[in-house]
Amino acid sequence: MNIYTETNKNTGRLIQIIGPVVDIAFPAGNVPNIYNAVVISGKNTAGEDMCVTCEVQQLLGDRCVRAVAMNPTEGLMRGMDATDTGTPLMVPVGKTTLGRIFNVLGEPVDNLGPVETEQKLPIHRSAPAFTDLDTRLAIFETGIKVVDLLAPYRRGGKIGLFGGAGVGKTVLIMELINNIAKAHGGVSVFAGVGERTREGNDLYMEMKESGVINESNLSESKVALVYGQMNEPPGARMRVGLTALTMAEYFRDINKQDVLLFIDNIFRFVQAGSEVSALLGRMPSAVGYQPTLATEMGGLQERITSTKDGSITSIQAVYVPADDLTDPAPATTFAHLDATTVLSRGLAAKGIYPAVDPLDSTSTMLQPWIVGDEHYACAQKVKETLQRYKELQDIIAILGLDELSEEDRLLVARARKIERFLSQPFFVAEVFTGSPGKYVALAETIRGFKMVFAGELDSLPEQAFYLVGSIDEVIAKAAALTSK
């Protein structure tokens, strides 16, 4: 791995400023490489010192380069000094990044002082070689029943997380961070790409409350945060995902850990690339997107993978513009996803959390030759039962349960129990639910649903299935309810 070292630097002059894009002239023969970081420094129009880091994107002739700024360019003046660092953007990596918040440049922005690390890595790196990849199809157990049973995640895979505001995306993300730390000894990296600053602040506060970030002992924290919010220049929003990915790669390759990488929101990564592409004068492609859309997306996604040392499993929130799944941005994202987790407002309104829609969520891993016949048959039976219940709901609403056949009444009763049994108390939500969190192993989940279908639990009240972990807790809760 290339650890950052100082190199001989050459200096140029700022000759043109076009919003967040700048042109810089260097001495002939000393033009920086594409993707090199260039630092512009000097006095701004108000006479104050300013420093702007840019990334070289184009070579204009034998002396000039066009670069994209990672900081606001207000106050820059022509003639300012621009120093080539000789390397791409370098960001800190390692255990000292846990519990901290960084910007795209790897600078801490949480007012907790500098990060004590000598190790820095460039954000532009090649994807792992084919010979280093781990091609085994292994399930990544999350301890969340509805995910593990119906739409299992692939170890080293990519998962799309779909859901509107207020349906529990943040809580689900925090539970996954908590579970990977406890069950897999892994760490997480969260990339806030082009989302609201308020949401980033809320997430940080909630992580501190739930113990995912340990403020008194940062080394015990389970996550590093990298933010490039929507008020920042497009260059920062375009590169913040790569900064977070570089930190995650270090944990995978050097610490040999399983890493969870969250990207919220992958659409904003594409959107920022579109803005930069237009500023660089490239001809737009379909719907005004950049002509390099597939290449840019592939460059990020291909680095998210399992190697023989460890894995990076990525969960990406996907915004679908105007609910149009054929839009080039979500359509390009879908090509890379192994699973989709869809959060339903209807389930959240019923108080069933996590509000994962069991019928809309999908996974390429749910195949009998990957998960085994028992798991596959159980998952299909759950989906069939819930689908039939959904079809019967109109009849129930108009005519009532009494008009159904005996067989359908039994199916509805089991479907309602299944719906509630797919809910689960979370560790990070203990303060809200008052119930201790539960991690449920996949084998235990399958055993529970098989008992439901075998009719062993038909006599139990459906409220016994709500917000519990394993099936044994259902039986204990039912006994407690009847004794009352």
Swiss-Prot record:
Its EC number is 7.1.2.2. CDD domains: ATP-synt_F1_beta_C, ATP-synt_F1_beta_N, F1-ATPase_beta_CD. One of its GO terms (molecular function) is ATP binding. Pfam families: ATP-synt_ab, ATP-synt_ab_N, ATP-synt_VA_C. It is a peripheral membrane protein. It catalyses: ATP + H2O + 4 H(+)(in) = ADP + phosphate + 5 H(+)(out). One of its GO terms (cellular component) is proton-transporting ATP synthase complex. Its main location: plastid. It is found in: Plastid, Chloroplast thylakoid membrane. SUPFAM superfamilies: C-terminal domain of alpha and beta subunits of F1 ATP synthase, N-terminal domain of alpha and beta subunits of F1 ATP synthase, P-loop containing nucleoside triphosphate hydrolases. PANTHER family: ATP SYNTHASE, ATP SYNTHASE SUBUNIT BETA, MITOCHONDRIAL. HAMAP family: ATP_synth_beta_bact (MF_01347). Produces ATP from ADP in the presence of a proton gradient across the membrane. The catalytic sites are hosted primarily by the beta subunits. This is ATP synthase subunit beta, chloroplastic.
